[in-house]
Regions:
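A structural "domain/chain start" motif
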Residues: 21-84, 187-205
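Surface-exposed short loop/turn segments
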Residues: 24-32, 97-149, 159-164
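Generic short beta-strand segments
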Residues: 55-61, 113-119, 154-157
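Short secondary-structure boundary motifs at beta->alpha junctions and helix caps
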Residues: 65-81, 144-195
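Mid-chain, structured segments of secreted extracytoplasmic proteins
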Residues: 76-100
Length: 205
């Protein structure tokens, strides 16, 4: 009986270890670090200073990870939800440009979507290349009429080499790609133009 119990205990331990190994992941603490101060195009326009940002829609093909599995089977995942990272980055840029983020009653509404937030790993002869790619789609909606006045898409790529600290290289590649995508948004003159084209709310009787 004792031998049978020991065998059963050993078997359950092996199964548990296999389960842990199958769920192993490499967690990256990805954040947003603006590369430069916002350029004039995104400066707040007088007609629309209050902005509502809708929850970011995740359109990624695989929303469970941000990079491929490594040789040891660890998939790259983000410590924070990707939609939260993108929303916070967008809010940070708009706030720096002089806009006020509000939960409701805004002059304009932004409807963001994240299409890609991914790290590719390219193993070379002497070094490993980490390629971060971020794609964000953004719709500007007139709060008064509910009409979409602008739809834009921002694509950014960043490359980093890293063998001594692959985790940091992967994180840096993705953070720089995110910063570039937001920089493109911040310097896009069509955004404040769309904000300024909003309709006046209907007068109350």
């Amino acid at each position: 009986m004792r031998t049978g119990r020991i065998a059963a205990l050993m078997l359950s331990t092996v199964v548990a270890l296999l389960g842990i190994g199958g769920c192993a992941s490499s967690v990256l603490d990805v954040g947003y670090h603006p590369a430069t101060a916002p350029n004039p195009p995104l400066r707040a326009v007088a007609q629309a200073r209050r902005v509502v940002i809708r929850p970011v829609v995740d359109r990624r093909l695989d929303d469970t990870r941000i990079g491929p599995a490594s040789k040891n089977g660890e998939a790259m995942v983000s410590r924070r939800p990707v939609v939260d990272i993108v929303r916070d980055a967008l809010a940070a840029e708009l706030t720096r440009a002089g806009y006020s983020m509000v939960a409701e009653g805004g002059d304009v509404v932004l409807a963001p979507e994240v299409e890609e937030f991914w790290i590719d790993v390219v193993s070379g002869y002497k070094t490993t290349l980490y390629v971060g790619r971020v794609v964000i789609a953004l719709a500007v909606v007139d709060a008064a009429s509910g009409e979409r006045v602008l739809v834009r898409r921002y694509v950014a790529i960043s490359r980093r080499e890293g063998d001594e600290n692959p985790k940091r290289a992967a994180r840096d590649a993705l953070e720089v790609a995110l910063a570039r995508a937001l920089h493109d948004l911040a310097t896009d003159p069509t955004i404040p133009a769309a904000f300024g084209s909003r309709s006046d709310p209907p007068a109350r009787s």
